[in-house]
């Protein structure tokens, strides 16, 4: 997808964009970015690690790179979703359903929220558990069609996809820097929140 390549373009491209932005002047109306671009910018500002993939082969390759980078090749991956475990059955994962034995959590999400770069999740992903009960590191598999403008759109999407039984335990993950990494960034909004070291494997499906 050319849009995501544009987002992660060269430094010279970014400088050119910044100059054009300055030329607009401070009194010009702000340009409204597309929701996928807004999400990517906000997500990275929150400390998330973003890997855009055009197909499943790239997803598997990126996953293996994450495992190597963190020395997780021999570690256990917490996977609650059986369908997700089947999808990644050919990868180098060592799946478990034990919270105590796992080093990281592989999951999906409900939606990706463009306005604040957060991930919307529910009991479909985390059952009735609290985020603090999970490993510090998350690997989230999602698709570009899951990007929504705001939480309201995300909640409406959850309702429309689950007409028979609306999931519970709906929450967002927004802070993607572990507490020791954000000591210089303390503020009252992040107090008490559950921070996660989070990788997003984003598959193009539009």
Regions from the language model: what does each represent?
Residues 2-206:
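The feature marks the mature, well-folded catalytic cores of soluble enzymes
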């Amino acid at each position: 997808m050319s849009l995501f390549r544009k987002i992660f373009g060269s430094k010279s491209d970014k400088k050119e964009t910044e100059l054009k932005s300055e030329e607009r002047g401070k009194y010009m109306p702000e340009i409204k970015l597309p929701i996928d671009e807004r999400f990517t910018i906000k997500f990275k500002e929150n400390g998330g690690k973003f890997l855009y993939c055009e197909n499943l082969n790239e997803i598997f390759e990126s996953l293996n790179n994450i495992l190597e980078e963190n020395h997780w090749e021999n570690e256990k991956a917490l996977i609650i979703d059986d369908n997700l475990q089947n999808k990644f059955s050919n990868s180098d994962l060592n799946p478990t359903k034990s919270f105590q034995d796992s080093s990281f959590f592989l999951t999906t999400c409900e939606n990706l929220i463009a306005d604040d770069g957060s991930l919307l999740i529910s009991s479909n992903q985390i059952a009735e558990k609290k985020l603090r009960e999970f490993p510090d590191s998350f690997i989230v598999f999602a698709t570009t069609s899951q990007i929504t403008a705001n939480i309201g759109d995300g909640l409406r999407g959850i309702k429309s996809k689950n007409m028979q039984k609306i999931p519970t335990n709906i929450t967002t993950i927004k802070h993607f820097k572990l507490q020791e990494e954000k000591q210089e960034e303390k503020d009252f909004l992040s107090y008490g929140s559950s921070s996660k070291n989070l990788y997003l494997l984003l598959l193009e499906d539009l």
